[in-house]
Amino acid sequence: MARGGRGFQGTVLKALRVPEHKLTVTGVREIPPYTELTVQCPSLLGARAAALPPTTWVRMWIPENGREYQRAYTLTRINRAQASAIILFLHHEPAGPASRWSSRVRPGATVAVQVMGGTSYRPPSPGDRMLLVGDPASAPALADAVDAAPAGSPVTVIMLAPETGHLPRAERDHQLIRLDPEVSEDKLLAAVDHALWADTGDLALDWVWIALESGVTKTVRRHLVASGMNRRSTQHQAYWIRGRAMGIASDA
């Protein structure tokens, strides 16, 4: 068990009486560049638990060397009957506490999680023409969003990801456009424009979700709004910040 408090964020969550849940790891699978954990938690994932919208992420308190590090990870493939879900940990260099923990964890291990502000996702309306733009960090959430899309909505996904390595994919039908992660900004925006405009010159999209590195996310969103997309139809969520860890450490 980690020693010490959980810092300011932990104090706020405690003051707001945000419930704490315990996830139990029941399965571990290596699918580079991810580690896939199957977890169970009746209080959060069971049949009587509150509904969780698509792309919901949990605040995980990752233990390491007597401290706890808060990191956010998306719950996917929720199975209410089994009170289970899948969490994918993307490995990168330099490795962080969550990446190291997922590499050494074994079935039977537990980890504390809380849910507060677990998603800003606004679901599309039936028939909306959808575009999602992401990368390996947000791919689990994008797959979850695509699987939850209305049956009559055509879906296009632009993914900045290498051709090699596992990439989480939705089971629902969708068009996937895979771009080199080092692609230039101009080429990324050109791919977005190709999805944005119909042959008639009219907008071909009703709903967009952008989930990339913080700076790139802002660039794509500004481009879409400048091109005529309604701001409320253009959602965005940065899944990482270049050169910075997304999370906090507990008090030592």
Residue locations for each model-derived region?
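Extended, composition-driven regions rather than compact fold-specific motifs
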Residues: 1-252
